[in-house]
Amino acid sequence: MAELGELKHMVMSFRVSELQVLLGFAGRNKSGRKHELLAKALHLLKSSCAPSVQMKIKELYRRRFPRKTLGPSDLSLLSLPPGTSPVGSPGPLAPIPPTLLAPGTLLGPKREVDMHPPLPQPVHPDVTMKPLPFYEVYGELIRPTTLASTSSQRFEEAHFTFALTPQQVQQILTSREVLPGAKCDYTIQVQLRFCLCETSCPQEDYFPPNLFVKVNGKLCPLPGYLPPTKNGAEPKRPSRPINITPLARLSATVPNTIVVNWSSEFGRNYSLSVYLVRQLTAGTLLQKLRAKGIRNPDHSRALIKEKLTADPDSEVATTSLRVSLMCPLGKMRLTVPCRALTCAHLQSFDAALYLQMNEKKPTWTCPVCDKKAPYESLIIDGLFMEILSSCSDCDEIQFMEDGSWCPMKPKKEASEVCPPPGYGLDGLQYSPVQGGDPSENKKKVEVIDLTIESSSDEEDLPPTKKHCSVTSAAIPALPGSKGVLTSGHQPSSVLRSPAMGTLGGDFLSSLPLHEYPPAFPLGADIQGLDLFSFLQTESQHYGPSVITSLDEQDALGHFFQYRGTPSHFLGPLAPTLGSSHCSATPAPPPGRVSSIVAPGGALREGHGGPLPSGPSLTGCRSDIISLD
């Protein structure tokens, strides 16, 4: 009961900040006014007074009144009424010394002030910094020292001084390296580190909030802030050592001063230390890792057997295990396979790439399982070293239940390579062949080049007109022949007869062509071009033609967009057509559709024009003007 009364007295002397810390530590609501917080704290003390809560109350009270802690005997004296003596005291009551009274008892309400400054933290606590793999410590310039904070102000300031010995100065100067851009760097550096003031385990680097550092009166650059993880969060700097060598006085006679400013936090203290270190490279760490030796392959085989051992309680059993020989970091073949002792997987990563990545940004995280993989726990796997030396043509292996392995070669699927289809101006035409072997038909391929003809060739060498005799019967299709793919300059079914009449260029140039507008839009560069000027170099020949396909009729229909042809256009052709062609050309066979250009000037049968009544054109066929 005496201890409970002592704890109650301690709680009643707390301020709002101590009450909030106590309630937050116990997981209770810490919002409200002081009397509400005090009632919650007393209820906590009566309901569940756990040992951790009791220790927290005593810790807060020691921080609140660091000089004197009241004991049970002192509390009994304070509980007696004035002028009375305790039981068994023969003499009169002696006055209670002021040091035994709590500061709150000497002052009235609302006059709570700190009568004594808080007890300073130890200057050199037993704080040890966690060693950094890329730095080798040569000397300790400032031992881990507490950044003392007072409750009187928000921002704190501390001053430190250190000096270099002549030997240390010589080491720093001889390690200077000139870098591109008129900069210099030192392999041996003066390193400043911050951490939490905790003695339970080696501490990692940790910056106080709102930190500012001045070395010899010059502001020291600090690592940039990390992006906040959530909105409203206070930005933090990445915790890493600070190189203050460029700002230090490299002299054995002049000391160096450090001024640190930071924001104090309730219940959290920080520590500062300065070291003389030598910076190492990834290659040096790789050599040190090789010097540690290669782990026995039997360890990995035992791990494989353990993973592949069948579980009697499980219905699914793993009989094999595939492992890649490619590094998950660089996607290249492993050269120095390593992994951490804390990793439970067999997959290894390349030690050289892992060290190079941590040299740029020290995270020391396993790329396979994303767990911590510090440099001290890295080992080189001897089993993978044997596999890499004996199997150089595969990138994946498979482990068996007995610890053996076999290479996994990729399956090569035979794929037929199809020739890409030809797109362009050049085309192929298969000529029909009668009978014969089908293999010979495939070999006979005629390649047609559509780009050999140009306007310049036409102007230099005008094409000669070929005249063919008129045949009255249709050409029968060859038996067994395939379809013919036709393109420009292919022999068509239009057969020409010898020239029967000529027509001068002056006649064509005098035709009133403006009466027949084109049925399709023409470009501006073609509208002003005289197309008939190309036809005046040679007189045109006319002859009867036999149209043996409906496609050519449609082509002529698009060529003659007009239906009624003026008599003055085809009038001069009537005598020639009537006298020479009608008697020489026999009538078309039944079922053959032909287009006849009559003197009356109309396309018949195929184009729906009126038929002439004269007997002179019976059985005659029209002449087609050949422009090629």
Curated annotation (Swiss-Prot):
Cross-link Glycyl lysine isopeptide (Lys-Gly) (interchain with G-Cter in SUMO2) maps to: 46, 56, 230, 307, 466, 482
**Which cysteines are cross-linked by disulfides?**
none
InterPro entries under this entry? PINIT, PINIT_sf, SAP_dom, SAP_dom_sf, Znf_MIZ, Znf_RING/FYVE/PHD
In which domain of life is the source organism classified?
Eukaryota
Keyword set includes Transcription regulation: yes
The places in or outside the cell where this protein is found are: Cytoplasm; Nucleus; Nucleus speckle
Give the organism, scientific name. Homo sapiens
Q: Which pathway is recorded for this entry?
A: Protein modification; protein sumoylation
A GO molecular-function annotation: transcription coregulator activity
Keywords from the named record: Cytoplasm, Isopeptide bond, Metal-binding, Nucleus, Transcription, Transcription regulation, Transferase, Ubl conjugation, Ubl conjugation pathway, Zinc, Zinc-finger
Please name the PROSITE patterns in this protein's record.
Answer: PINIT, SAP, ZF_SP_RING
Q: Which gene encodes it?
A: PIAS3
Which family does the similarity line name?
Answer: Belongs to the PIAS family.
Name of the protein described by the UniProt record: E3 SUMO-protein ligase PIAS3
**Carries keyword Transcription?**
yes
Q: Domain PINIT, which positions?
A: 115-280
Q: Where is this region: Interaction with CCAR2?
A: 1-200
Motif LXXLL motif, per the record, lies over 19-23
Zinc finger spans (SP-RING-type) are: 312-393
